[in-house]
Amino acid sequence: MRLNTLSPAAGSKPEKQRRGRGIGSGLGKTGGRGVKGQTSRSGGGKVRAGFEGGQMPLKIRLPKFGFFSRKSLVSAEVRLNEIAMVEGDVVDLSTLKQAGVVTKNIVFAKVVLSGNIDRAVTVRGVSVTKGARAAIEAAGGKIEE
């Protein structure tokens, strides 16, 4: 016995039905497609997502709202516990990028009160929230605008 000589037992697999080959086959005439309509046609039923057959699509019926701020693509929030990952006493945009806290495309960063900081750091050129400012100054650090 070899792998290339194996075949299924006789009668274990039904023969493929040939569509549209007469009434006696059970799938004659319309071949299981029903009568008329888009899905009965060759290549029919393939429509793009959101297409509603010519009816005004839901996406267009609903009103437009809001906008996408492009500044959000170049802005980031920095938590206090992420500042602890920065080596050295001075924290600015370049040191945050070197430490991998923010990505290289970030232009604006803001330190927010989340987590805690246990060492004195000087935050330079990065905006800081009131709560984060209090926490940094309580740890002996300072903020330079």
Curated annotation (Swiss-Prot):
Region (Disordered): 1-50
UniProt feature, compositional bias: Gly residues: 22-35
Pfam families in the cross-refs: Ribosomal_L27A
Statement: the UniProt record of this protein carries the keyword Ribonucleoprotein: yes
SUPFAM superfamilies for the chain: Ribosomal proteins L15p and L18e
Gene3D superfamilies: 3.100.10.10
UniProt keyword terms in alphabetical order: Ribonucleoprotein, Ribosomal protein, RNA-binding, rRNA-binding
Any one Gene Ontology cellular component term annotated for this protein: cytosolic large ribosomal subunit
GO biological process: translation
GO MF annotations, alphabetized: rRNA binding; structural constituent of ribosome
The organism's place on the tree of life at top rank: Bacteria
Disulfide bridge positions per record: none
HAMAP family for the chain: Ribosomal_uL15
Protein family according to the UniProt entry: Belongs to the universal ribosomal protein uL15 family.
Complexes and interactors: Part of the 50S ribosomal subunit.
Function recorded in the entry: Binds to the 23S rRNA.
Name by which UniProt lists this protein: Large ribosomal subunit protein uL15
Species of provenance: Aeromonas salmonicida (strain A449)
Lineage: Bacteria, Pseudomonadati, Pseudomonadota, Gammaproteobacteria, Aeromonadales
